[in-house]
């Protein structure tokens, strides 16, 4: 895995069974020394080349299973390990054009030993009041290439 949260490997358009491009995908790694349960994750807003992508257009694939943001919120059993990146799939008819694209995405998660005052202030779209990248509390940016 790469050091950056947004991984370059796996950034590509997605095709359906008829060969039509229905969107794109990219991978993110968990910047934490322990894994987390899906219910702990707080997905943020994705921007691609400055365009906002709505959360309902994104699914997360973890351990080979695909989840919506709503499904993750209530999943207390599925565990995301630090050694396995998640695949985020974005519904976008026609996908992305070949070339470079700027991705901006933040997510964070709760922790049992994180003080409540910090958990109450979690906003995956903004930098945290306390800089703690190990909790994913920062917005990630990366320029990636689709060929």
Curated annotation (Swiss-Prot):
pH and activity: Optimum pH is 6.0.
Function: Carbon-carbon bond-cleaving enzyme which participates in the metabolism of C-glycosides. Acts on the C6-glycosylated compounds 3''-dehydroisoorientin (3''-oxo-homoorientin) and 3''-dehydroisovitexin (3''-oxo-isovitexin).
Protein name: C-glycoside deglycosidase beta subunit
Cofactor requirements of the protein: Mn(2+)
Assembly mode: Heterooctamer composed of four alpha subunits (DfgA) and four beta subunits (DfgB).
Activity control, per UniProt: Activity is strongly reduced in the presence of chelating agents.
Known EC number: 4.1.99.-
GO molecular function, one term: lyase activity
Source taxon at top rank: Bacteria
Keyword terms: Carbohydrate metabolism, Lyase, Manganese
């Amino acid at each position: 895995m790469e050091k950056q949260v947004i991984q370059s490997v796996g950034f590509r358009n997605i095709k359906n069974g008829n060969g039509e491009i229905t969107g794109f995908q990219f991978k993110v790694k968990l910047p934490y020394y322990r894994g987390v349960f899906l219910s702990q994750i707080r997905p943020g807003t994705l921007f691609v080349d400055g365009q906002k992508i709505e959360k309902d257009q994104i699914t997360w694939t973890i351990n080979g299973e695909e989840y919506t943001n709503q499904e993750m919120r209530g999943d207390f059993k599925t565990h995301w390990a630090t050694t396995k990146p998640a695949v985020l799939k974005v519904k976008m008819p026609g996908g992305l054009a070949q070339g470079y694209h700027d991705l901006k995405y933040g997510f964070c998660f709760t922790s049992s030993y994180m003080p409540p005052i910090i958990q109450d202030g979690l906003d995956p779209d903004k930098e945290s009041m306390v800089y703690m990248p190990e909790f994913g509390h920062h917005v990630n940016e990366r320029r990636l290439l689709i060929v």
